[in-house]
Amino acid sequence: FESENPDYKNRQRLEVYLTNASSFLKGRRIFVDHFYRVNGNQGSNNLYINHQFNYENKFFEFAQGTVPSASNGNVVYRFGDSFKTSGINDQTHYNRMYNKLGLTYENTSLGKFQFFVDDFRSNYYYNQILIFDTRTVSNALAQKINSAGGQYEYRKNKWNGTFLYSRSITNQSLSNLDAKMQFDLDNENQFTFQYQNINKLPNNNYNLYQSSYVAYNWSNNFNNEKINSLSASATTPWVNASFQFSVLKDHLFFDDIATAAQKLAETQIVSPSQ
């Protein structure tokens, strides 16, 4: 449709499962990144105090007028059984606040050395707790994470690079190692190399999700995802090439758990898995 293919020019001719559903995402963001140079005049050696602040607030809504839909003349319950027969209105709320305070030493020959501590707080929540016969789906995930780390930036002649390492100092075991180098042979030829080793928390919607659809409600406690990644790229007048090799541990994904009967009825059921 977006490519203006004449076969799909009339969008209403495309058959979809949900003809009366809509989704809405609203967000607000405040971002401040500033620094103060301790030494009075810019010189070959400089000392800075850095501060970064980020606040985000998001609201997501999914609305659907009627639960059943039509496909090839058949009535389809696309996401299975629902607590409601009509008027679905599911809402998710999320807010986060991030503060980072750092001290940076800059030398025109050696590069920049930064040491920092940060504070991350988030709240992901719904307006109700769901109680089933054998399980309970909570209404909120709250996180408070403090980390410490360092970063080194180097720019000399045709080389520039950034090396970052941070690790949580609170109960969560989180870490991030990111090393990136770029070589500019000339204005038209650049080569980039990067290595990442990340230990991160699962996305919130894997650990907590609520919906008007019965099968789409869960509360989990998955392990952290671990990612090892090596990549390289080359940009030249003749070719743009890139390479990436990644090893994933405790990878999270949504698994199709629909039964044969549900698939025959065009019902789609997925569940988070690790």
Please place each PLM-identified region on the residue numbering.
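Solvent-exposed, glycine/polar-rich loop segments of beta-barrel outer-membrane systems
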Residues: 65-78
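Acidic/polar loop-and-plug regions of large Gram-negative outer-membrane beta-barrel proteins
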Residues: 1-25, 29
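Short hydrophobic/aromatic-rich motifs at helix boundaries and adjacent loops
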Residues: 3-7, 72-75, 148-153
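A generic structural signal for ordered alpha-helices
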Residues: 8, 12-13, 81-82, 159
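Outer-membrane beta-barrel porins/channels
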Residues: 78-86
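Exposed, low-structure sequence patches enriched in small/polar residues
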Residues: 20-68, 86-274
